[in-house]
Regions:
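Short, low-complexity disordered leader/linker segments with a strong preference
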Residues: 1-38
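Bilobed "Venus flytrap"/periplasmic-binding protein-like clamshell domains
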Residues: 47-53, 162-191
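Sec-exported extracytoplasmic/periplasmic mature domains
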Residues: 55-64, 87-91, 100, 107-111, ...
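Residues embedded in well-ordered beta-strands
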Residues: 132-134, 242, 255-257
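Short helix-loop capping/hinge motifs at secondary-structure junctions, enriched
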Residues: 138-144, 163, 176-184, 262-270
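Ligand-binding pocket segment of bilobal, Venus flytrap-like solute-binding proteins
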Residues: 181-247
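Extracellular/periplasmic juxtamembrane helices and adjacent flexible linkers that interface
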Residues: 263-343
Length: 343
């Protein structure tokens, strides 16, 4: 009996040791797993350079703060197309898109928590931009303002408003100019924008594609461009191009959000939230400014004030907000569909 009892005790000790050891190994493994984490940032077309720069800065900050190594993967394309990709299953932890409507489209599918606009400052728009013209050296066609775009011999490069956020800003800026110079007549604005699109030889799906068409393929006389994209082209290609600032443009406000459903699935909410929060710090704002986005932090904006020209700007509010603008101009059967004649 004593031998049997001793054997039972021995078996219990061995089992307990095995369970303890297994738990310890599991804990160590789990701890090691948390030493590194990966995020996916699904963004719009011309933010590649911005987020390569920012990701390195954020990773350094996060490592120092938490000891955790964070790797941020990037996905880029036309903003509308990117929003559709997330809706269709691309598992973004964060989205950094060209405009509010595209983020709201993801929210409407239940992937982003309601009220995302108010979670961060400036309606979750951490930096600003606008639309300018990029022309070839010497400005051979003498392009100075929007009305020059409809001269007989001018070819205009702009992306497709159905897929590109930048293209929608381009379109609305042109519409605003036409309204201003035609006593706010929507009919005359529609006619002007229709005429403008007859000068567009090709519609790329995103802003970077249009830049490639203009800069590398040599197609067109003027590129309607994000301001940061125009600055970047000048930086990379020197004196081959010039930037023309039109008399009127539009305040472009790219917006950001955590994709709630995906961060819950990936267990990345904490780092994803911090990733967007850090865009608003002085360091994050300087990264944006270095990449030719207009910072919203007053101190950093002052530091870079000489970099950005002063502009007369309309805002999306002048179009009744993005829901109304999208429905009126860019939804199926909207104004763009009515005026654009496919080549």
């Amino acid at each position: 009996m004593k031998m049997k009892r001793s054997l039972q005790i021995a078996m219990f000790v061995i089992l307990a040791f095995a369970l303890t050891t297994s738990s310890a190994f599991a804990a160590v493994s789990k701890k090691n797993e948390k030493k590194s984490i990966t995020l996916l940032n699904v963004s719009y077309d011309p933010t590649r350079e911005l987020y390569v720069d920012y990701n390195a800065v954020f990773a350094k900050y996060w490592k120092k703060k938490t000891g955790q190594t964070v790797t941020v993967k990037q996905s880029h394309g036309g903003s509308g197309a990117q929003a559709r990709s997330v809706i269709d299953g691309l598992e973004a932890d964060v989205v950094t898109l060209a405009l509010e409507y595209d983020v709201s489209a993801i929210e409407q599918k239940g992937l982003i928590s309601k009220g995302w606009q108010s979670r961060l400052a400036n309606n979750s728009a951490p930096y600003k931009s606008t639309i300018v013209f990029l022309v070839r050296k010497g400005n051979p066609k003498g392009i100075k303002d929007w009305d020059d775009l409809v001269k007989n011999d001018v070819k205009v490069i702009t992306p497709n408003p159905k897929t590109s956020g930048g293209a929608r800003w381009n379109y609305l800026a042109a519409w605003a100019y036409a309204l201003k110079h035609n006593n706010n007549s929507d009919d005359k604005a529609k006619a002007f924008v229709k005429e403008l699109f007859t000068h567009v030889p090709v519609l790329d799906t995103g802003a970077r594609g249009s830049t490639t068409t203009f800069v590398e393929k040599g197609i067109g006389d003027v590129l309607l461009a994000w301001e940061n994209e125009a600055f970047l082209a000048k930086k990379e290609y020197g004196d081959k191009f010039e930037i023309v600032t039109p008399s009127l443009s539009i305040l472009a406000e790219p917006t950001v959000a955590v994709v709630t459903k995906n961060v819950q699935k990936h267990d990345t909410r904490q780092v994803a939230t911090a990733y967007l929060d850090y865009l608003y710090t002085e360091e994050g704002q300087r990264v944006a400014a270095r990449n030719f986005y207009r910072p919203i932090n007053p101190k950093v904006a002052l530091e870079y004030s000489k970099q950005f020209p002063k502009l007369n700007l309309v805002t999306i509010k002048d179009f009744g907000g993005w829901d109304k603008a999208q429905k009126t101009h860019f939804a199926d059967g909207g104004t763009f569909d009515q005026i654009y004649l496919k080549k």
